[in-house]
Amino acid sequence: MKKFRWVVLGIVVVVCLLLWAQVFNIMCNQDVQFFSGICAINKFIPW
């Protein structure tokens, strides 16, 4: 049962990361000033 909980936790983390990547892409496309520096770094991370 403990292993199942770790699997669920792992899936939740992956989904959160994917959603975060989507938010980043939207913000970068909007060219929000605050995100411009983060977007530069984000381009080097292969999502």
UniProtKB/Swiss-Prot annotation:
The chain crosses the membrane at residues 6-26. GO terms for biological process: negative regulation of phosphorelay signal transduction system. InterPro entries: MgrB. Pfam families: MgrB (PF13998). It comes from the Bacteria. It is a single-pass membrane protein. One of its GO terms (cellular component) is plasma membrane. It is found in: Cell inner membrane. NCBIfam families: PRK10299.1. May form homooligomers. Probably interacts with the periplasmic domain of PhoQ. PhoP-regulated transcription is redox-sensitive, being activated when the periplasm becomes more reducing. MgrB acts between DsbA/DsbB and PhoP/PhoQ in this pathway. Represses PhoP/PhoQ signaling, possibly by binding to the periplasmic domain of PhoQ, altering its activity and that of downstream effector PhoP. Belongs to the MgrB family. HAMAP family: MgrB (MF_01596). This is PhoP/PhoQ regulator MgrB. The lineage of its organism: Bacteria, Pseudomonadati, Pseudomonadota, Gammaproteobacteria, Enterobacterales. The gene is mgrB.
